[in-house]
Structures are given as structure tokens and as C-alpha cells.
Design a protein with these regions (language model features):
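N-terminal subdomain of nucleotide-sugar transferases
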Residues: 1-65
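Carbohydrate-associated surface elements
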Residues: 173, 195
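A short helix/loop element that forms part of the nucleotide-sugar donor recognition site in Leloir-type
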Residues: 202-215
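A conserved nucleotide-sugar
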Residues: 218-219, 233, 237-283
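Short alpha-helical donor nucleotide-sugar binding micro-motif in glycosyltransferases
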Residues: 287, 295-300
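Aromatic "clamp/platform" in nucleotide-sugar-dependent glycosyltransferases that forms part
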Residues: 308
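Short hydrophobic beta-strand element within catalytic cores of glycosyltransferases
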Residues: 325-328, 338
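Conserved acidic donor-binding segment of nucleotide-sugar-dependent glycosyltransferases
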Residues: 340-341, 345-352, 361-366
Length: 411
């Protein structure tokens, strides 16, 4: 198949770890790679955010990244991009009409990309599949007045659900949300999870990881992810402070803005650790390159991800692929990916006491950690490889393409 993948704010070329970069960037890059290895050809359309970017950038064999104009060629927070989305649409139309071989369908990622896909279905006759990655109703419910989504988001998501030929939900929780909050047509929903590269994220000798990273020996808890309030890192620090002193545990927090050593969130979290008298046991590493993350997961006795809410959650997959047990919030995709009592534990969000209890259990029982480590790696290889995800996505895309009338690319 010839696929047009739209990801307006999350380029596969982007650095990870910033406020608006993370799981979607990984998803788009890895899914595109695996689809290409299956013989599909893809153009990934994203917004040009630098004057140095050419229009077309070869990414992998069979994959090109197409940088389209949409507002200033600089970084813009994703919630401020909608005023430029019509410009993005028009540039997409021009490119799509000029490609030698017409696209079979569009795969839209995030709601603004879905808006473009709705327009392209109407004007170019292109069928489309949608992956939301996050839902506006959930964000509004969880963030309240702090939600910075533009007012057009809700109507756009409703339109997308009415017009999409297929919606790829990443977890059962998202299926429930689409049905209950949006009245989605269940016949057009397909469960396609996110994945992880099990060659990149694989077990590593813990003592070697400690030595290479300069982490002192002893029980180690690791957090990897963005440093924004909804990720619940404050809950983790509060829980860590409840652990008994005799454990002599260390907390390593990996994440932050690329190239930025200090930020308001790091200051807030550091001050909290100081207030709770554990600052000397907490290390903030700042943003780290993807290739280094395996070492941090490998150094951990347990990885923690306890967001207030999370549409899916990629870091639990990465940790489990590295054979590291995970304690995660019972929210979103985490409550499915982490098998409670088997590959780690699930706890309520914003509950430091519950989290501390599970951390103490894992840090105090090496046999339990070993058992969960083996189960974690096994679960990932059975259910969450990118190859598995690509096969599920291809099946959905093929059904969409087979049911679509053939439309001239010049329509």
C-alpha cells in the first residue's frame, strides 16, 4: 500500500523529551519503519518547525518525512497550532496531487491531523484511519482550567469519529472512552496498541549499568519521562520519602527539556525532595538520548510511572522490555500493559502511600523482582513488539483500502 501518514506536530525527526515531544514521535517513527519493512511505502507529513529543514527528508527505505508549511518555521506549542492547520491542509493537497502514485489511504495521528484527513476525504476522496493518541474530553476532565486545548478540538473530534473509516484505539480504556463519551460506532473501532523496539530495549547487566552511569550500588528506583505536573513525579518523590532509611534506596529521575538543565518543574520537584529530606538520594539526570535509556532501565530494580492520567504510556513498555518490573498508575493504557501482580503493580494515581507500599515490597524481595522481570520481558515479546503492532495496523488499513472506491489523485 501507498500510505500518507499525517502527524502535524510530532515529527519522527524530532528530539524526545520536550513538552510536546514523546510517545507520538516514537509511535509514528517506529510504525512507519515496520510498515516499510512489510513492503508498504509511506510519506509522513509533519509541520516544518525549522527553516533548515528541506521539504522532503529520506527517513528509512520506503519512508520519507515531508515537512509542510504551517505558521512560522519554528517550535510552536501544539495547542497553538490550529490557526495554521488550513495552511498545512493546502500544502498537503498540493503534494498529494503531485505524487506519481496516488495514496491508498491516510493514517492521521492526533486530532488536528484528523481534521486534515476529514478535509482530504471530502476534497481528494482519500479514505482514512485515525489514531487519536489523546482525547480532548479526557484532557478537559483531568486538567480543568489548566487545559490549553483550542475550543475547536471537541467539534473536530466528533467530526473525525463520524467520518473516519477506521479508528485505531490504543487500549481498552480508550475504546470505553470513545464509546461512552463520544458515542463512537463500535464497528469502526479497532484495538491496535503502541509498541516497543525489543532490540533497542533489552535486558542489561545491572551492575554494569550502575557502573557506566555512575549510579551508586544499592536499591534503585527509576523514572523516565517528561517532567510535567500531570506525570505525577511529585507523587513518586513523596512515596520515596516514605521508604525506610535502612533500604538506602536511590531515586533517579530521567527527563526534561533537551539542552535545559534547570526548569521550573525541576526546581519544584527538587524543592519538594529537599523539603522531604531526601534530596541527597534523588538524582535529576536531565534529558537523555534514546540510546542511553536502556542503561537507566537496566540499572533500576523497579521503574515507576504514576501519571494522573495517561492515554497509553510508552515508558512502561520500554522498562518491561528491559526486564524491569513496573509500578504504574491504574489509568489509561498502563492498566492494561502492566499486568498487576505479574509484571509489576498498579496503584491509584496521586497516592504516595500505596506507591510506597508497592516499592517497599519489590525492593525487599529479590525473588519477586526476578520473577516479575522474566514475566515483563515475556509479556512485551508476546503482545507489544512493533512488528505485532504493524501487522494489526496493516490488517485495519487493508480493510479500509479494500472498501474504498478508487479515486483519481487529481480529483
Amino acid at each position: 500500500m501507498r500510505l500518507a501518514m499525517i502527524s502535524e506536530h510530532a515529527s519522527p525527526l524530532a528530539a524526545l523529551g520536550g513538552e510536546d515531544s514523546g510517545g507520538q514521535n516514537v509511535y509514528v517513527a517506529e510504525l512507519a519503519r515496520r510498515l516499510a519493512t512489510m513492503g508498504h511505502r509511506l510519506d509522513v507529513f509533519t509541520r516544518r518547525d525549522s527553516t533548515l529543514l528541506p521539504t522532503v527528508v529520506p527517513f528509512e527505505r520506503g519512508v520519507r518525512v515531508v515537512n509542510l508549511p504551517a505558521g512560522p518555521a519554528e517550535s510552536v506549542p501544539k495547542d497553538e497550532l490550529f490557526p495554521f492547520i488550513a495552511e498545512f491542509r493546502d500544502a498537503f493537497y498540493q503534494f498529494a496531487r503531485e505524487v506519481p502514485t496516488a495514496y491508498d489511504l491516510v493514517h492521521a495521528n492526533f486530532w488536528m491531523s484528523g481534521w486534515v484527513a476529514c478535509e482530504a476525504k471530502r476534497d481528494l476522496g482519500l479514505p482514512f484511519a485515525q489514531t487519536f493518541h489523546a482525547l480532548g474530553e479526557i484532557k478537559k476532565r483531568e486538567q480543568g482550567a489548566a487545559d490549553t486545548s483550542p475550543p475547536e478540538r471537541q467539534a473536530a473530534e466528533v467530526r473525525i469519529l463520524e467520518e473516519a473509516d477506521r479508528v485505531l484505539a490504543t487500549c481498552p480504556a480508550e475504546v470505553e472512552e470513545l464509546l461512552d463519551l463520544y458515542g463512537a460506532d463500535p464497528a469502526r473501532l479497532t484495538l491496535v496498541p503502541c509498541g516497543v523496539d525489543v532490540r533497542k530495549f533489552r535486558p542489561v547487566d545491572q551492575s554494569k549499568a550502575h557502573k557506566k552511569l555512575g549510579i551508586p550500588d544499592g536499591p534503585t528506583v527509576v523514572y523516565v519521562g517528561r517532567l510535567v505536573p500531570r506525570k505525577g513525579v511529585d507523587t513518586l518523590i513523596e512515596a520515596f520519602a516514605l521508604l525506610p532509611d535502612h533500604l538506602d534506596a536511590r531515586l533517579v529521575i530521567v527527563g526534561g527539556e533537551p539542552g535545559v538543565e534547570v526548569s521550573p518543574e525541576v526546581d519544584r520537584l527538587s524543592n519538594l525532595a529537599e523539603k522531604l529530606k531526601v534530596r541527597e538520594k534523588v538524582t535529576f539526570t536531565g534529558s537523555q538520548p534514546q540510546k542511553e535509556l536502556r542503561l537507566y532501565y537496566g540499572a533500576a530494580d523497579v521503574a515507576v510511572t504514576v501519571p494522573h492520567y495517561e492515554p497509553f504510556g510508552m515508558t512502561p513498555l520500554e522498562a518491561m522490555a528491559c526486564a524491569t518490573p513496573v509500578v504504574g498508575s491504574r489509568v489509561g493504557g498502563i492498566k492494561t500493559s502492566v499486568a498487576d501482580g505479574e509484571t509489576g503493580y498498579l496503584v491509584p494515581p496521586k497516592d504516595p502511600e500505596a506507591l510506597a507500599g508497592r516499592l517497599l515490597r519489590l525492593l525487599s524481595d529479590g525473588a519477586l523482582r526476578d520473577r516479575m522481570s522474566r514475566a515483563a520481558r515475556r509479556r512485551i515479546k508476546e503482545h507489544y513488539t512493533w512488528e505485532h503492532v504493524a501487522h494489526l495496523a496493516t490488517a485495519a488499513f487493508s480493510e479500509v483500502a479494500a472498501g474504498a472506491p478508487r479515486i483519481s489523485k487529481t480529483a
